[in-house]
A protein has these predicted regions:
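Conserved SAM-binding loop
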Residues: 60-176, 283-290
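Conserved class I S-adenosyl-L-methionine
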Residues: 15-69
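S-adenosyl-L-methionine-dependent methyltransferase catalytic module, highlighting the catalytic core
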Residues: 40, 44, 48-53, 57, ...
Length: 290
């Protein structure tokens, strides 16, 4: 269990510097957007725009999915600093944002509300044509509730793009076999938890991975809530996976030798596909609500 990327520690450091002075006097508007007077120190140290809190390549993949689709209203939750929202806005979409820590948001001109994916988000039913929810499900207490909210908030035929750490690629399977945990879901000692709490200025949820979710669980929750998968993607290829090719070949041979009905029942071909078995750190799923 760790912060996803170094930017999270950078953001947390800025918060530590400014938290007591800025949040004590910041004004909050009715949309839940935190703002500051002109003579007030920055809410976050440094005068810069939003930076991606996800791994490199993830936003590129999401934009590649969205660009061919009709323009519409998108909810980005969790939104982080607003880096993905900025790119979707530039692509012509009407973007709304939501995050458990809305004070992190840095994108001007876009609505930001505070909300928890484990609860009820502050929007009316069927408000959105699209929802992007990247690197959020693994951090929350109740992923099933998040899928119910996706269903409630999307219009019929709406698109959902989600991402989680890929715990089912060949490298992570080996780590689980050898150590009993994966790269993204390590055991946490009391000292580790205290360090995360300090480094992330008390906002533990942005760092702690609480729920490992594999492809099987994602597909189950999607189908249970009326979604049909349109595509499965990886954020990038991992350079060292060639070391596992003999095992990958064996897995795929065993898959081909499995009777067709059992392969279909157990999603064997999907679990042996490149995005899952040879995926990078993150798996991305695009689905449509029927």
């Amino acid at each position: 269990v760790e912060c996803d990327t170094p930017i999270l520690f950078a953001v947390a450091s800025e918060i530590v510097i400014q938290k007591e002075t800025s949040l004590a006097t910041a004004e909050t508007v009715s949309t839940s957007r935190t703002i500051k007077p002109a003579d007030h120190p920055p809410l976050l140290a440094g005068d810069r725009g939003p930076m991606a809190m996800s791994r490199p390549g993830l936003h590129d993949t999401v934009l590649g999915i969205l660009r061919p689709l009709p323009r519409g209203v998108i909810l980005d939750c969790p939104a982080g600093e607003g880096a993905l929202a900025e790119r979707m806005l530039a692509a012509g979409f009407d973007v709304r944002c939501c995050d458990l820590y809305s004070e992190l948001f840095r994108l001007d001109g876009v609505e930001i509300k505070r909300g928890d994916l484990s609860g009820i988000l502050p929007y009316a039913s069927q408000s959105f044509d699209y929802i992007t929810s990247l690197d959020g499900l693994e951090h929350i207490d109740s992923p099933p509730q998040a899928f119910r909210e996706y269903r409630r908030l999307l219009k019929p035929g709406g698109h959902l793009i989600i991402s989680v750490p890929n715990i089912m690629n060949i490298e992570e399977r080996f780590k689980w076999l050898l150590f009993g945990y994966t790269s993204h879901f390590k055991p946490l000692s009391e000292q580790s938890k205290a360090k995360i709490h300090y480094d992330c200025a008390g906002m533990d949820e942005i760092a702690v991975h609480a729920n490992p979710i594999g492809y099987n669980e994602l597909r189950y929750y999607l189908e249970k809530n009326g979604f049909a998968i349109q595509g499965v993607y990886r954020d990038r290829k991992k350079a060292n996976q060639w070391l596992y090719w003999p095992i990958v070949a064996l897995i795929r041979l065993l898959a081909k030798l499995t009777p067709q009905k059992r392969r279909a029942d157990r999603w064997t071909d999907e679990l042996a596909s490149d995005p899952v078995l040879l995926g990078g750190n993150t798996i991305i799923i695009h689905s449509i609500q029927h």
